[in-house]
Every structure is written in C-alpha cells, then in structure tokens.
C-alpha cells in the first residue's frame, strides 16, 4: 500500500555497519546481493553489498563508485567490510537467500569468505516454475 513504511539505508559509517550486523544476527532469513564489476565471478570486484531481512527494509554498502574520493571505512573499504561481515556470512545457522546466489558465493570466496546457510535461490526457483 501507499502508506507502507519503507526503510532503505546506505551504510556509510562503521557504526551503521555494526547496526546492520546486529539486525542481520537477529533475523530468520538474510537476503544477500552483490553488485560487481563483471558477470564473470573469477574476475569480478565487489562494487557494493545489499542486505534485506524483511519486506520494505534493506541496506546497501557502497564500496566502489565513480564519485568516491576517500575510503569510507578506512584504508581498504572492502577488507574492513568483509572482515566485519565474515562471521555472519559463514554462520550456517543464519539462513541466506539471493538471486543467482552461486555467483555471489564464488565472488565472496575470492575475498576469503565461505558463505554457509544457503536456504533459497530465487533464480533456481524461477527456472523451476518457468523452465
């Protein structure tokens, strides 16, 4: 409906990243999506990460973009962000879903993250419903 509250956030500080992590830890299902520089997961660099835990609520963590002049999180944004999110992404008790999540898993593996707890892939579901 028109009056439905929408909570969309851009994570630009370590405090905001820590708030996101608290929200992710308390959820039943985490939707994950990466924005990258390539469709080839072997060479893709992470441009940003998106997370959602409920309808009309999401977070985006920008890593690389044209207007970027300084690091947001420190010397190496991606390393700081990945190090903070790694425990959640590797926690098999936290269910995760995504669109073509296999791609995201391959990219994150190159960054040292072995994502666990995959529960659903919307791309596979779409293919099964409409082969």
At which residue positions do the language-model features occur?
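Electropositive, glycine- and tryptophan-enriched low-complexity nucleic-acid-binding patches
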Residues: 56-59
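Long, highly charged low-complexity segments
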Residues: 1-51, 63-88
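Charged catalytic and DNA/RNA-contacting regions of genome-maintenance
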Residues: 54, 89-96, 100-131
């Amino acid at each position: 409906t028109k009056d439905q509250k929408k909570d969309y956030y851009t994570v630009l500080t370590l405090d905001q990243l820590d708030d996101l992590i608290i929200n992710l830890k308390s959820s039943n299902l985490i939707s994950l999506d990466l924005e990258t520089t390539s469709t080839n997961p072997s060479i893709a660099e992470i441009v940003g990460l998106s997370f959602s835990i409920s309808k009309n609520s999401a977070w985006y963590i920008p890593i690389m973009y044209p207007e970027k002049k300084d690091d947001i999180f420190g010397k190496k944004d991606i390393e700081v962000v990945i190090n903070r999110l790694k425990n959640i992404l590797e926690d098999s008790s936290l269910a995760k879903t995504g669109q073509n999540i296999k791609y995201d898993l391959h990219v994150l593996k190159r960054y040292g993250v072995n994502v666990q707890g995959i529960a659903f892939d919307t791309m596979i579901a779409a293919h099964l419903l409409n082969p």
